């Protein structure tokens, strides 16, 4: 009798359980951004902000090879935005913090990031990581586009260029 009771309980549990159904369509997931890796993109790709506010955008790499340095040539509408600061992301962090130089000139932000070698490595790990975060202030209303310029390059520890197949765009709408 106990055996029959246990069998009925186990049977009820098995037939009443159902696998969870998840909708895996987050537009911010790297698999859903429609870029061929290795790629560079802006996260978030679309920003809605008010006038005279501070915003941030991350410069992301999708399935990047290990790198020792980067020159990120960022184009933006300098009549609508001002660059406040740039902070290196985790892609170039090892035992030492990376060295970063940012030069902002009339809508062209040149960011140079260098991995500082340590006893274990002379370049970053591969993967999908944030290369840097750019902090901006909005100064006029309208639409602004963020682009990676033609001078954007990544190099490995031997100073060989790392191929980037695709570049995403970013959009900032200021109301």
Residues of each region from the PLM?
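Sec-dependent bacterial lipoprotein signal peptides
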Residues: 1-16
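Acidic, low-complexity intrinsically disordered segments
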Residues: 17-175
């Amino acid at each position: 009798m106990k055996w029959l009771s246990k069998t009925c309980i186990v049977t009820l549990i098995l037939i009443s359980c159902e696998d969870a159904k998840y909708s895996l369509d987050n537009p911010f997931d790297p698999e859903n951004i429609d870029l061929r890796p290795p790629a560079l993109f802006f996260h978030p790709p679309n920003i809605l902000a008010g006038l005279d506010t501070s915003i941030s955008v991350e410069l992301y790499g999708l399935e990047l090879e290990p790198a020792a340095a980067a020159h990120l040539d960022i184009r933006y509408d300098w009549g609508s935005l001002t660059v406040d600061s740039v902070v290196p992301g985790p892609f170039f962090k090892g035992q030492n913090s990376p060295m970063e130089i940012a030069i902002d000139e009339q809508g062209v932000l040149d960011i140079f990031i260098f991995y500082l070698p340590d006893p274990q490595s002379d370049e970053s790990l591969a993967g999908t990581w944030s290369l840097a975060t750019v902090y901006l202030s909005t100064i006029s209303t309208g639409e602004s586009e963020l682009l990676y310029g033609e001078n954007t390059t990544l190099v490995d520890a031997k100073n060989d260029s790392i191929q980037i197949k695709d570049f995403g765009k970013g959009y900032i709408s200021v109301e």
